[in-house]
Amino acid sequence: MSLRSLFVAGLATLALAVPAPQIQARQGMSSNELESGPCRDVTFIFARGSTEQGNMGLIVGPGVCSSLKKDLGSDKVACQGVGGAYTAQLAPNFLSQNTNQASINAATDMFDLANTKCPNTKIVAGGYSQGSAVIDNTIQALGSDLKAKVKGVVLFGFTRNVADKGQIPGYPKDQTKIYCAVGDMVCVNTLIITPAHLTYGADAGDAAKFLASKVQE
């Protein structure tokens, strides 16, 4: 069986293991507070994992958003998912950047919007699974001025963990926190999906506290 077949089969198997209410909840997890709302002190940009619906997904993105609002104040944080050309399809995982350029461009648009619409906002970001590669590649390519406005990044099930040596190249390591669960094969340079890859919701609160600490420095 090919690696791609294992990846697809793994996702299918895990989907069957997800309780029905959770599957139903996946249908509408979106947040567009940067695009549609007022400027806030902090802007959280998140890229979901492959096959997740909405622009925030379900596994971890919404949890980090809600925890960050709890820690800093709901009126202080704008949460924005990466949508548009980032459709979270499976195939881009097999490309050299573990995602495609269109997805990276979609995320870049959100960072650019935060910078131009809300020049005083502090930007934090996160990504899960393929979304971790989207955010990783996006931040690497940001101009120095905009990159300096990104105060913290959290990555879950980091598909480029080995390739990028546990960090985002060209971005401060102390402003990055990577979550790789024991048994998550995605973090060790494979695309084999195991149950551990679905556990990152448990890390949402810790990730939010990390991001909150960075915007308060």
From Swiss-Prot:
Biological process (GO) annotations?
lipid catabolic process
Q: Which residues does this entry assign to the site Transition state stabilizer? A: 50, 130
Q: Where in the cell is it found?
A: Secreted
Fetch the Gene3D superfamilies from UniProt: alpha/beta hydrolase
Which of UniProt's keywords are assigned here? Answer: Disulfide bond, Hydrolase, Secreted, Serine esterase, Signal
PROSITE patterns per the record?
Answer: CUTINASE_1
Q: What is this protein called?
A: Probable cutinase 3
Which source organism does the UniProt entry give? Aspergillus fumigatus (strain ATCC MYA-4609 / CBS 101355 / FGSC A1100 / Af293) (Neosartorya fumigata)
